A protein has these predicted regions:
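Carbohydrate transferase catalytic cores enriched for Leloir-type hexosyltransferases
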Residues: 1-185
Length: 185
């Protein structure tokens, strides 16, 4: 989904976050890892080409990487793309050595809170990701709302000290509409 031509949800969050961080901190070298067979589109995730962003593709089918991660906890992605800190914009199969501080963003836990709204296939997928194991491995968790933080504490027993709430910013295209604007009718 991150290499999809139509960008929404987590890919949009990721692109906007990296764009903002790379702009705010030009002294930091931002290394972006992605995998799969697809070619990265020219303006992937709406990231402008910045001299402090470098790309680290792993040309391998994601299903193969996911299978190896699930069965063998390999490949250790932080060995492939070393960094001072790993930022995971969403939980997925992410085999890491545990030697690099890691921050994980959790957008919601609806699949745990209301599993009846998910197909058996989606429930299996979420269960296979072993989210509790990943949460134990990471150093910090960003929750995008107080509700997500509460769900993390209630459903997965995550200590509140490990969670920071950072709300997602509004899309810059969003602008207030004047009361006289005919679109309000």
């Amino acid at each position: 989904p991150l290499l999809a031509k139509q960008i929404s949800g987590i890919p949009e969050y990721t692109g906007r976050l990296i764009n903002a961080l790379a702009t705010a901190h030009p002294e930091v070298d931002w290394q972006l890892f992605y995998s799969g067979w697809r070619q990265r589109p020219d303006n992937w995730l709406n990231l402008k080409e910045k001299p402090n962003i470098s790309w680290h593709p792993l040309k391998c089918p994601n299903k193969l990487i996911n299978g190896a991660a699930w069965l063998f906890d390999r490949p250790r992605l932080d060995k492939y793309c070393p960094a001072d800190v790993w930022l995971l914009p969403h939980f997925n199969f992410t085999p890491l050595t545990g030697r690099i501080p890691t921050v994980l963003t959790i957008h919601d836990l609806s699949f745990l809170r209301q599993p009846e709204f998910f197909s058996w296939r989606r429930r299996f997928w979420h269960a296979s990701l072993h989210l509790p194991r990943l949460i134990n491995k990471v150093d910090r968790i960003v929750a995008i709302s107080e509700n997500t933080k509460r769900d993390l504490m209630e459903l997965l027993a995550v200590p509140k000290e490990k969670i920071t709430v950072i709300y997602s910013a509004a899309n810059p295209d969003f602008q207030p509409i004047a009361p006289s604007d005919p679109r309000l009718v």
